[in-house]
């Protein structure tokens, strides 16, 4: 969860890439409609482009399933889609472990909101609680029992909003759109960025006046962890190819590994890196550009 452009989609695609490597079937549910196949390909997602007679890309195929707002326009439709796939899996028609990847909770309303032509947050939260908290989340947890033939996982991006302080000496709080049902059922919650702002800084590659975004540095915090029990906070560097540790050796290694990519964008491998922006008041870690 987190504000816009803080690394959430990067984390989701990394999960999908690793799922493919493990033989797990990624199931994309894209209701945010900011999906980029090119970005996914850069990060290592495996798929084939399907072209028409004129050479135009009309579809994509591979070891994954994909659905978006073309068919999923409400919380209930997302839930039915997931439930149908789990049923097909139980019948043996989808003989894979599945990793559902939803981008994002808070981007679609509930059926009642649509029928009433009002995007009511309380109705949406109620639908999330009914469809997921009391139903699908439990099915996913039950798939982790030893006697279950398949194991399913849900990785979801949750849109957020900032609640103002309740009193003059209070602090603003980050709240999930769609209510707290997913928070309560989650085994791992990661927050990217800060409470009141994105909490990122841009790292630009500069050569002869040309500026290209090289990466972003973002705050990250493990707010809930029922897997290893460890909660921590720090910073990571996100690039178009995935995450990097926040240190100079890692970014130098990345720069060298993708030199053809940067040569194409910048026109040279001899460029300067300049960091711009303010990560706010979170703990300072060594600057990766030092």
State each model region's role.
Residues 15, 39-42, 78-81, 85, ...:
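Alpha-helical scaffold elements adjacent to nucleotide-binding pockets in ATP/GTP-utilizing enzyme cores
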Residues 125-243:
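Phosphate-binding/switch region of NTP-binding enzymes
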């Amino acid at each position: 969860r987190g504000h816009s452009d803080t690394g959430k989609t990067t984390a989701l695609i990394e999960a999908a890439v690793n799922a493919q490597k493990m033989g797990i079937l990624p199931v994309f549910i894209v209701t945010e409609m900011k999906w980029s196949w090119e970005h996914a390909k850069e990060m290592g997602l495996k798929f084939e482009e399907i072209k028409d007679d004129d050479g135009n890309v009309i579809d994509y195929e591979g070891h994954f399933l994909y659905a978006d707002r073309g068919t999923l326009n409400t919380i209930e439709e997302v839930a039915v889609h997931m439930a149908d796939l789990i049923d097909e899996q139980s019948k043996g028609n989808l003989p894979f472990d599945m990793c559902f990847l939803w981008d994002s909770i808070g981007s679609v309303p509930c059926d009642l909101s649509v029928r009433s032509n009002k995007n009511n947050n309380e109705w949406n939260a109620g639908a999330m609680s009914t469809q997921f908290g009391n139903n699908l989340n439990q099915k996913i947890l039950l798939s982790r029992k030893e006697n279950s033939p398949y194991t399913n996982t849900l990785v979801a991006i949750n849109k957020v909003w900032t609640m103002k302080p309740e009193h003059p000496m209070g602090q603003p709080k980050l709240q999930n759109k769609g209510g707290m049902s997913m928070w309560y059922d989650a085994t791992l919650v990661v927050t990217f960025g800060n409470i009141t702002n994105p909490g990122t800084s841009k790292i630009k590659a500069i050569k002869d006046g040309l500026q290209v975004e090289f990466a972003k540095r973002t705050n990250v915090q493990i707010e809930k962890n029922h897997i290893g029990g460890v909660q921590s906070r720090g910073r990571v560097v996100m690039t178009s190819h995935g995450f990097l540790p926040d240190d100079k050796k890692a970014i130098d290694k990345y720069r060298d590994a993708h030199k053809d990519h940067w040569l194409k964008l910048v026109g040279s491998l001899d460029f300067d890196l300049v960091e711009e922006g303010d990560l706010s008041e979170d703990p300072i870690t060594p600057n990766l550009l030092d």
